[in-house]
């Protein structure tokens, strides 16, 4: 009788950790004061949901990603305000993960009038909330090497 009770208590104490809120993501650079993107701020943006296939060492893998476009995040936070589109094309941004992994993109890649790459800041994969934070995926890439797990910062340069 004691063992089942201990199991239930253990599960109840772990429940908050299993449903912990996703951490904030910092946006820095290009003359803007650093911005901490919270899940509540991102929830106010339009949601995109897309099936994305990447080549893996085990063959193609398809997942359904749900989140917000990074372009929408930058626009909503006025990160590129004051820059003409031509000036925006000279800018890049570095996406950093909690483990130190970094990938660079150009604004031209994601700008709707140019590359229009729909970089997605993902909150759920295959209908399940992510553990450990936000993920960035680049639909259209053949391989997932530019996907960033547990995004902590987007630095505009």
Regions found by a protein language model. Give the residues of each.
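Bacterial N-terminal signal peptides
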Residues: 6-15
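Positively charged n-region of N-terminal signal peptides that target proteins for export
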Residues: 1-4
């Amino acid at each position: 009788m004691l063992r089942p009770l201990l199991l239930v208590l253990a599960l109840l104490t772990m429940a908050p950790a299993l449903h912990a809120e996703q951490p904030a993501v910092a946006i820095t650079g290009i003359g803007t004061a650093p911005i901490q993107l919270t899940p509540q701020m991102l929830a106010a943006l339009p949601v995109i949901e897309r099936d994305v296939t990447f080549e893996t060492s085990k063959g193609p893998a398809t997942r359904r990603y749900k989140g917000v476009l990074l372009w929408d995040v930058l626009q909503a936070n006025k990160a590129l305000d004051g820059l003409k589109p031509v000036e925006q094309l000279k800018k890049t941004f570095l996406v950093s993960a909690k483990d130190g992994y970094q990938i660079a993109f150009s604004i031209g890649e994601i700008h709707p009038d140019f590359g229009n790459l729909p970089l997605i800041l993902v909150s759920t994969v295959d209908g399940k909330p992510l553990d450990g934070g936000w993920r960035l995926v680049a639909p259209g890439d053949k391989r997932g090497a530019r996907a960033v797990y547990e995004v902590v910062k987007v630095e505009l340069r």
